[in-house]
């Protein structure tokens, strides 16, 4: 089902998740990490939360083909051009997943205080049952999923819960060079987050490749 990759399915009710913890070799991942640190126009995205504009707790860059504008939290982002370092990765994903991703959100987590809150990648421009390909570079961080509607998630707001599955919730550790693929009803049934952590951690870059099918549509999250 996934040529040219070692993706293995993860058992989570109603979700379609696959993970290859070593999709890129260490040499490939090291080179890409260094190239993206220097070659991406990192910026602090301003988003709307609780009725006011706030700085996102991370650095980001929206990258894509012409016309792939992206709007979330009532803020519209125009795509930066694809950096040369990402073109081979885009092609490799196309071959592995048979999807021509036309955009990618790059997030840079500088330390354990940088994080991503609970959300689903369910923007209308992604269409029903979107495929999200997430490549992680740099320090390993814990990635959490919980069913939509679940209000509490033990201690993962601090990134301290051990990897594993409990009561329909899941925590994964995403290492350097890993590939996580979310598809099917994953976004409709689950929210995910990258919690902050008090543990000392080095920098991490995450690349979430997407295919926008309704260019310029409004996103809600």
Regions found by a protein language model. Name each.
Residues 1-155, 164-221:
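Non-heme Fe(II) oxygenase metal-center motifs and adjacent flexible, charged/small-residue loops
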């Amino acid at each position: 089902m996934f040529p040219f990759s070692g993706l293995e399915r993860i058992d989570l009710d109603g979700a379609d998740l696959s993970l290859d913890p070593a999709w890129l070799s260490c040499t490939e991942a090291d080179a890409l990490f260094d190239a993206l640190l220097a070659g991406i126009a990192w910026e602090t995205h301003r988003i709307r939360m609780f009725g006011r504009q706030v700085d996102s707790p991370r650095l980001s860059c929206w990258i894509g083909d012409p016309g792939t504008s992206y709007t979330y939290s009532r803020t519209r982002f125009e795509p930066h051009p694809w950096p040369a370092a990402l073109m081979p990765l885009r092609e490799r994903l196309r071959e592995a997943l048979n999807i021509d991703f036309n955009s990618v959100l790059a997030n840079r987590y500088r330390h354990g205080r940088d994080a991503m809150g609970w959300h689903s990648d369910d923007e209308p421009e992604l269409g029903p049952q979107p495929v999200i390909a997430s490549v992680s570079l740099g320090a390993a961080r814990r990635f959490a999923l919980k069913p939509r509607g679940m209000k509490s998630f033990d201690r993962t707001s601090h990134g301290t819960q051990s990897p594993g599955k409990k009561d329909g919730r899941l925590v994964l550790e995403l290492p350097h060079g890993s590939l996580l693929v979310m598809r099917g009803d994953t976004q409709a049934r689950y929210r995910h987050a990258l919690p902050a952590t008090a543990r000392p951690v080095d920098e991490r870059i995450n690349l979430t490749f997407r295919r926008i099918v309704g260019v310029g549509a409004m996103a809600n999250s």
